[in-house]
Amino acid sequence: MSHPALTQLRALRYFTEIPALEPQLLDWLLLEDSMTKRFEQQGKTVSVTMIREGFVEQNEIPEELPLLPKESRYWLREILLCADGEPWLAGRTVVPVSTLSGPELALQKLGKTPLGRYLFTSSTLTRDFIEIGRDAGLWGRRSRLRLSGKPLLLTELFLPASPLY
């Protein structure tokens, strides 16, 4: 099962430098905190619609592969993050199998829990970078995060209903 928003997410083209954009737009795109929390601050009830979750091989993550360790399998999670039932963000998380050890095994068991609720409660979370991308008028971003030094890649596409626009 796929979703058109995830197809567009995978089509994002990334800027080599942070573009000169309106401050409000950059505030959303460069947010270091949880996007789930930001949506809730808008007075919304946040929920997850699961699109796809499970192990994949390298050939299913060509966009992410250069940014992650080369391994035989990766945990892939594709979701829509909804605010009061309306999709505001498409998310794609790729986790190398070597990251899935110790407390990070919980990444496989999030179910309908937003990723941000898990990540941003961890004292071991760090971020290597945020890259801004755009496709067909929609903005997105990707970040390589680390939990206890172990990497994962999160890509987010802001959908037309989101307050970023």
Curated annotation (Swiss-Prot):
Annotated EC: 4.1.3.40
Location within or outside the cell: Cytoplasm
Reaction equation(s) it catalyzes: chorismate = 4-hydroxybenzoate + pyruvate
Primary location: cytoplasm
Binding site for substrate: M35, R77, L115, E156
Keywords attached to this entry: Cytoplasm, Lyase, Pyruvate, Ubiquinone biosynthesis
One GO process term, biological-process aspect: pyruvate biosynthetic process
Top enzyme class: lyase
Pfam families in UniProt: Chor_lyase
Metabolic or biological pathway, per its Swiss-Prot or TrEMBL entry: Cofactor biosynthesis; ubiquinone biosynthesis
Leader peptide range in chain numbering: none
GO MF annotation: an example: chorismate lyase activity
Keyword Cytoplasm among record annotations: yes
A GO CC annotation given for this chain: cytosol
Electron transport found in the keyword field: no
Cited function: Removes the pyruvyl group from chorismate, with concomitant aromatization of the ring, to provide 4-hydroxybenzoate (4HB) for the ubiquinone pathway.
Subunit structure: Monomer.
Protein family according to the UniProt entry: Belongs to the UbiC family.
Xref: HAMAP family: UbiC (MF_01632)
Name of this chain's protein: Chorismate pyruvate-lyase
Gene of this entry: ubiC
